Curated annotation (Swiss-Prot):
Phylogenetic lineage: Eukaryota, Metazoa, Ecdysozoa, Nematoda, Chromadorea
Name of this protein: Ligand-gated ion channel 4
Cystines in this chain: 240-254
Annotated function: Acetylcholine receptor.
SUPFAM superfamilies linked to this entry: Neurotransmitter-gated ion-channel transmembrane pore (SSF90112), Nicotinic receptor ligand binding domain-like (SSF63712)
Topological relation to the membrane, as annotated: Multi-pass membrane protein
Primary site of residence: membrane
Length: 636
């Protein structure tokens, strides 16, 4: 001990002696300076005066030539600069009293713990690669403790759970025990974990390549009876099979399996200090709620090694997902998009945007389905509820597109088929019973009813009027024939007002309906007769009729009668055409009403299907997930 103390003192003096000092009188000279050592006054005898402190020697510095490392000291020729006396100036903060106090404290330090550390870890008596045991046939009992600090991440796509945990591993090492009375009542010491033996306990279901890089270990605490406690923190990434059936309303149970990698139960007996994990320092996760955590000891026998049992500590972490994020970002948009597809049945077909709206809805559903598939694991073991709901919604939107095409064709069926009548069974069941059940009143519009009534009344009046006028003309010709001899010399200067009425009515009808009905021949006849009547009307008088002009009267009556017949025929054809157009309008209106009733029926059906899908795929499975009612889902 005295020798060690002397060596320590000499080293301290040497360090102090080599402290840089300022050199006086050596400006602009780049040379190396040799420092003088501290001189200690020699102690001649025990009775002589003892120096109370160390003094710094004073002297001149010897200057070495530049680039003369390792060479002997060379004296310079006397110059004027050497005449200046160089002095060693100590550091400003140097205190000789503090140095003396430090040396005295060093001499009074107790080295018992250091000596105990060296004696325990002496390589002649301790080998860290050898398993500690009293006899090699006895196992080393290792106690395992687990503290969960945080659930960092659940990677559903890669099926891995990342947790931050603290481990407490304890075992007995008889080689590290000592007698407290012989070592100043030292009860425990701390030793670096790399200096002693440690059990090779690892995470069996590890899912990361750099396993040991995530371990943060502290010093190992060793007590006097050989009890070793190893505390360390780690960021574990373990494989965890994800159950996606009820995603995003799912519960996940992940296991962390710890075991010795190379020692079976005959060498390392791994046990638990408690069956409940420590949650005193747990930090809540934003995505999962921790339901429960248990620790179980299992003894595993592998098929490849049936003669050995391997103790394993299984930490089961039960978590429940918080579905609020997924409800607002995945489910609510899907419900709204499905509702927009259903509301497409209420859009009038005349707008021509029903199909565009449903196709846009279908594309939106596809985009949201793609975002779902990127977040759930690509597994075929089960289909998540949200995926089933999206597929069902896509199917309903596709069906809505198909039935909207059918209803649009039905709406245009009356105009496309040139007046094809609605089948009788459709009129009876759809326009009759189904419309009544849907609380829809099928009545002809007032315009069609009034038009039909007016056309029918007008046709009756015209026909009776023409027949009456034809009879009147015939009677008039007979009367004129009888009185021809009596009025032979009388001249008729004015035309009968009835003829004016007939002529004006004929001209009005010809002007209002100039289209021919019977080809070019009828058009030529009407042209000649209209010229004749126009001349009669423009002149305002009949040609002078005398006894010698019977042929003119006969010609006029013949032409006039022929014109009336053709006018009657044209009016009749015009009425028939109007009746055909009215009938087509009525048929087209019936098809439109039929399409409206079908749209109302499909609206009710798709609303019911949408609500039924939400209840069956999103509500019932979450509420009754533990009942046998949902066993049908296992079929998929």
């Amino acid at each position: 001990m005295v020798i060690c103390h002397s060596c320590t003192t000499f080293c301290i003096l040497l360090v102090i002696d080599l402290v840089p000092c300022r050199i006086v009188g050596m400006e602009n000279v780049e040379n190396r300076v040799m420092f003088s050592l501290l001189d200690r006054s020699p102690q001649t005898n025990d009775t002589g005066p003892k120096p109370e402190k160390f003094e710094i020697a004073k002297g001149k510095f010897k200057v070495l030539e530049e680039n003369s490392i390792g060479a002997d000291t060379v004296s310079h020729l006397p110059t004027t600069r050497e005449e200046h006396v160089s002095a060693v100036v100590p550091m400003p903060n140097f205190d000789p009293h503090r140095l003396e106090k430090a040396l005295r404290t060093k001499g009074s330090i107790d080295g018992t713990e250091e000596a105990l550390y060296r004696s325990l870890l002496d390589h002649t008596v301790y080998e860290k690669d050898v398993r500690p045991c009293i006899h090699h046939s006895q196992p080393t009992n290792v106690t395992f403790g687990f503290l969960l600090n945080q659930i960092v991440e659940m990677d559903e796509r890669n099926q891995a759970l990342t947790t931050r945990s603290w481990l407490n591993i304890n075992w007995m090492d008889p080689r590290l025990s000592w007698n407290e009375s012989l070592w100043s009542d030292i009860k425990a010491i701390y030793i670096p974990h790399a200096r002693i033996w440690k059990p090779d306990i690892i995470l069996v279901n590890n899912a990361i390549r750099e396993y040991y890089a995530s371990l943060v270990s502290t010093d190992v605490m060793v007590t006097s009876d050989g009890n070793v406690t190893w505390l360390f923190s780690a960021l574990f990434r373990s494989s965890c099979p994800i159950r996606v059936r009820y995603y995003p309303f799912d519960d996940q149970q992940c296991d962390l399996k710890f075991a010795s990698w190379s020692h079976d139960i005959t060498e390392i007996n791994l046990g638990l200090n408690t069956d409940k994990g420590d949650l005193s320092s747990y930090m809540n996760n934003s995505e999962f709620d921790l339901v429960d955590m248990t620790a179980v000891r299992e003894v595993v026998r592998f098929p490849s090694d049936t003669n050995s049992d391997w103790p394993t500590i299984v930490i089961r972490i039960h978590m429940h997902r918080r579905p609020l994020f997924y409800v607002f970002n995945h489910i609510v948009p899907c419900v709204l998009i499905s509702s927009m597809a259903v509301l497409g049945f209420l859009m009038p077909p005349e707008t021509g945007e029903k199909i565009n709206m449903i196709i846009t809805t279908l594309l939106s559903m596809g985009v949201y389905l793609q975002s779902i598939t990127e977040s759930i694991p690509p597994t075929s073991e089960g289909v998540p509820l949200i995926g089933m709901y999206y597929v069902s919604s896509l199917l309903m939107v596709c069906l809505a597109t198909c039935v909207n095409v059918i209803t649009l064709n039905m709406h245009r069926n009356g105009a496309a088929n040139q007046g094809r009548h609605v089948p009788a069974w459709m009129q009876k069941w759809i326009l009759g019973y189904l419309a009544t059940f849907m609380r829809m009143s099928i009545r002809e519009p007032d315009s069609i009813a009034l038009l039909k009534a007016s056309q029918s009344k007008k046709s009756t009046i015209r026909r009776s009027s023409i027949l009456r006028d034809l009879k009147r003309v015939k009677n008039m010709s007979n009367v004129r024939a009888k009185s021809k001899e009596q009025n032979a010399n009388r001249e008729c200067e004015c035309m009968d007002p009835l003829v004016h009425i007939y002529a004006e009515s004929i001209m009005t009808s010809l002007v209002s309906d100039p289209k021919p009905m019977n080809g070019s021949t009828i058009r030529e006849d009407f042209a000649s007769e209209s010229t004749f009547l126009g001349r009669v009307v423009s002149d305002g008088i009949m040609p002078r009729i005398s006894a010698s002009s019977n042929s003119v009267l006969t010609e006029f009556e013949t032409r006039f009668r022929r014109i009336l017949k053709r006018v009657y025929r044209s009016l009749q054809q015009h009425e028939i055409r109007e009746e055909i157009l009215d009938e087509r309008s009525r048929i087209q209106w019936q098809w439109q009403q039929l399409a409206s009733v079908v749209d109302r029926l499909l609206l009710c059906l798709f609303c019911t299907a949408t609500l039924f899908t939400i209840i069956c795929l999103l509500i019932v499975p979450v509420v009754y997930r533990d009942n046998d009612v949902l066993s049908i889902l296992n079929f998929f």
